[in-house]
Amino acid sequence: MPYASLDLDYDKEYKASWVVYPNSNFDPKVGHYLYNTYLDELEMGEELGFDGLCVNEHHQNAYGLMPSPIVPASALARRTSKAKIAVLGNAFGIREHPLTLAEEHAMIDCITGGRLISGMVRGIGAEYYSMGANPAFSHERFHEAHDLVIRAWTDEGPFSFEGKHY
C-alpha cells in the first residue's frame, strides 16, 4: 500500500522515504482514499478468483502504509468469504508483546472460519530503529516471539514462559 501522492522529487529535500520522511507530507484525505481503494482492490481479488489476499507490515515510510496488517486483515475477514487472508509479515520482534498478536491472529482466524495465514517476520533494521528497538537483538527477539506465539496457539491450558525479551 504505497502512498501514491509521494512527491517524486522528495529525494532533493529528504535523505530517504523511510524513518526520516516527515509525516507532514501525509494528507489524511489522500490516505482515506488510498486505504479504501486498496481494500476495494483486495476484495476484488476474491471476486476475480484469487485464492489468497495478502497484507504486510511496514513502519514510518512512504512505500508501505500498513503499520498494522491486522487492521486490513480484519476488514477483509468480514467482507470476503472464500479467499485465504495472508498476513505475510507481522513483525513480531518489534511489537509490545507477541501474545497480543497471537490473540489478534486467532481472533481473525475464528472470524474467517480458518482462512487466516499467519506470516511471522523479523522486520528490518530501519523499522527496529523507528520503533525504538535495538536491531542487534532482532534475531533472538523474533525467535523468542515465534516460539511463544506457537505455544499460545498449540499448548493446552495455561503455561509458563520466561524468555530474555518476553
Regions found by a protein language model. Give the residues of each.
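Structural motif
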Residues: 56, 88, 119-121
